[in-house]
């Protein structure tokens, strides 16, 4: 039985995505699903080679064939997932292997629909999520989500950015039970080039671009 599906959408990250895969603990109750979104570098070839060289990792590699965008790629990843929980490991991030492994061990001890973890960011600071402020919204990277809870929810494929925000909004309307683990398990590449916050700060994304 698959406890956790680790989902990675990737586009032109031929080196960083391998670092993320290297950080994943090797265990029999997880699966890793990577979907390439029409990369023009060696990303897809590197992923296929990695899969061949690491049979200890239960891994599937898919290709969109052309660039479909983050939302469409995320929807395809979710459709392929088999785990009771899923987690998005972004292609330029890594997990803190031992802590992440511990958190997977503890997943069944949580009764929540969402299990949140704390994040380590680029400057060495730790984002300790504050339960009193409902901070599990902060990034999709900080959450293990029970797959059955979000059945029927999809990422909107017609927005230019912020697709994870719309997914989160619809998910929260279902009033999930959120549990905060307090475990620092994810190394978040923040601020990341191309993030919603980064694009808005540089004037490359306007509020009207965030309309579904």
Question: What are the functions of these language-model segments?
Answer:
Residues 13-26:
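Short, well-formed alpha-helical segments that are part of the catalytic scaffolds
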Residues 16-18, 41-50:
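Acidic helix N-cap motif at the loop->helix transition within catalytic regions
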Residues 36-45, 66, 90:
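A conserved acidic beta->alpha catalytic loop
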Residues 64-81:
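Glycine-rich, basic loop-to-helix element that forms the pyrophosphate-binding segment
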Residues 86:
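Short aromatic/hydrophobic "clamp" motif used to bind/position activated sugar donors
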Residues 94, 98-128:
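Conserved donor NDP-sugar-binding/catalytic core segment of glycosyltransferases
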Residues 118, 178-185:
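Catalytic beta-strand/loop signature of glycosyltransferases that borders the donor
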Residues 160-167:
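Acidic donor-binding loop at a coil-to-helix junction in glycosyltransferase catalytic cores
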């Amino acid at each position: 039985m698959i406890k956790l599906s680790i989902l990675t959408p990737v586009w032109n990250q031929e080196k960083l995505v391998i670092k993320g895969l290297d950080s994943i603990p090797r265990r029999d109750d997880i699966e890793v699903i990577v979907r390439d979104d029409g990369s023009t570098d060696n990303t897809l070839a590197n992923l296929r080679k990695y899969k061949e060289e690491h049979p200890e990792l239960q891994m599937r590699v898919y290709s969109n064939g052309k660039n479909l965008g983050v939302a469409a790629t995320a929807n395809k990843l979710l459709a392929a997932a088999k785990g009771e929980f899923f987690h998005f490991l972004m292609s330029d991030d890594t997990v803190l292997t031992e802590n992440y492994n511990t958190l997977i061990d503890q997943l069944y001890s949580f009764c929540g629909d969402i299990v949140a973890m704390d994040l380590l960011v680029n400057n060495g600071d730790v984002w300790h999520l504050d339960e009193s402020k409902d901070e599990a919204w902060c990034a999709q990277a900080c959450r293990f989500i029970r797959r059955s809870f979000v059945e029927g929810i999809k990422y909107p494929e017609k927005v230019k950015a912020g697709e994870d925000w719309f997914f989160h909004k619809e998910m929260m309307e279902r009033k999930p039970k959120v549990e905060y683990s307090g475990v620092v398990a994810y190394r978040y590449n923040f601020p990341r080039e191309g993030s919603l916050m980064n694009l808005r700060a540089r004037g490359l994304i306007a509020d009207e671009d965030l309309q579904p």
